[in-house]
């Protein structure tokens, strides 16, 4: 089955892997992006604003930049950061991140909805990071989100899809792409997310903390592609408490 491109605010992408760039050695970024096969890289505005050794100088040409509003504690701060990012990165894409507690770094859905509505009215392609509440996901759609990005588990935790049940509800009811963000720690977890119907996966910590960063990025690429293909092909039915023979049970030789 031929797949359709990932559509974000009218922009089409073949890759369904979004790569973070927060703590890499700058000299590794180009190789990591190339091994990942990604077309979208996200970064904090402060990393792009550095006058010397800006991350922007190391990201290959043709990559779509997705600046985030990391550090924002409310909608107004997120909007201010997004406007600065538009000037610095020359893009309308923005990943809204609003967290006002530092222990668990959970996104504030109410402020995120407010910021999404404000930024969508200004022509941004808004991709909000959210706690996986299906009601909030619908409200973000109504506010103008181009995609929703529910966390799989605590950011940076590598714990995988701890919020699976709620994410499945979001996927089943979404009219915009659902991108799993935060907590994906292994390629197998990224594959699992794609098998359950996610439109894309964002990973950063799992790649950045690997012994061989470019190779791990490539592993995620293949896992995401495999999970997408499995989803499109139609997964086999799971049977509980009984075996299903894989060979004929009649016509034996006597």
From Swiss-Prot:
Record flagged with keyword Transferase: yes
EC primary class: transferase
Domain of life: Bacteria
GO terms under cellular component: cytoplasm
E.C. number: 2.8.1.10
Residues the record marks as active site: 95
Protein's pathway: Cofactor biosynthesis; thiamine diphosphate biosynthesis
Catalytic activity of the protein: [ThiS sulfur-carrier protein]-C-terminal-Gly-aminoethanethioate + 2-iminoacetate + 1-deoxy-D-xylulose 5-phosphate = [ThiS sulfur-carrier protein]-C-terminal Gly-Gly + 2-[(2R,5Z)-2-carboxy-4-methylthiazol-5(2H)-ylidene]ethyl phosphate + 2 H2O + H(+)
Location, primary (coarse class): cytoplasm
SUPFAM superfamilies hit by this protein: ThiG-like (SSF110399)
Pfam families: ThiG
UniProt GO molecular function: thiazole synthase activity
Biological processes, Gene Ontology terms: thiamine diphosphate biosynthetic process
Location within or outside the cell: Cytoplasm
UniProt keyword list: Cytoplasm, Schiff base, Thiamine biosynthesis, Transferase
Protein residues bound to 1-deoxy-D-xylulose 5-phosphate: 156, 182-183, 204-205
Family: Belongs to the ThiG family.
Assembly: Homotetramer. Forms heterodimers with either ThiH or ThiS.
PANTHER family: THIAZOLE SYNTHASE
Function of the protein: Catalyzes the rearrangement of 1-deoxy-D-xylulose 5-phosphate (DXP) to produce the thiazole phosphate moiety of thiamine. Sulfur is provided by the thiocarboxylate moiety of the carrier protein ThiS. In vitro, sulfur can be provided by H(2)S.
UniProt protein name: Thiazole synthase
Species this chain originates from: Bifidobacterium longum (strain NCC 2705)
Organismal lineage: Bacteria, Bacillati, Actinomycetota, Actinomycetes, Bifidobacteriales
């Amino acid at each position: 089955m031929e797949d359709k491109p990932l559509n974000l605010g009218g922009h089409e992408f073949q890759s369904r892997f979004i790569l973070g760039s927060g703590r890499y050695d700058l000299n590794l970024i180009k190789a990591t992006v190339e091994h990942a096969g990604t077309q979208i890289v996200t970064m904090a505005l402060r990393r792009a604003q550095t006058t010397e050794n800006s991350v922007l100088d190391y990201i290959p040409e043709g990559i779509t930049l997705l600046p985030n509003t990391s550090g924002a504690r409310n909608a107004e701060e997120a909007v201010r950061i997004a406007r600065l990012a538009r000037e610095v990165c020359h893009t309308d894409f923005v990943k809204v991140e609003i967290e006002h507690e530092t222990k668990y770094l959970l996104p504030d859905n109410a402020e995120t909805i407010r910021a999404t509505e404000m930024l969508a009215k200004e022509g941004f392609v808004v991709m909000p990071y959210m706690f996986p509440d299906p009601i909030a996901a619908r409200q973000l759609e109504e506010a103008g989100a181009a995609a929703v990005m529910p966390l799989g588990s605590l950011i940076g935790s590598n714990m995988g899809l701890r919020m699976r049940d709620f994410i499945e509800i979001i996927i089943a009811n979404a009219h915009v792409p659902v991108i799993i963000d935060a907590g994906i720690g292994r390629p197998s977890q990224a594959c699992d997310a794609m098998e359950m119907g996610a439109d894309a996966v964002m990973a950063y910590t799992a790649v950045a903390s690997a012994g061989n960063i470019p190779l791990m990025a490539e592993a995620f690429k293949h896992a995401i592609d495999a999970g997408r293909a499995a989803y499109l092909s139609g997964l086999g039915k799971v049977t509980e408490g009984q075996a299903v023979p894989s060979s004929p049970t009649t016509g034996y030789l006597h």
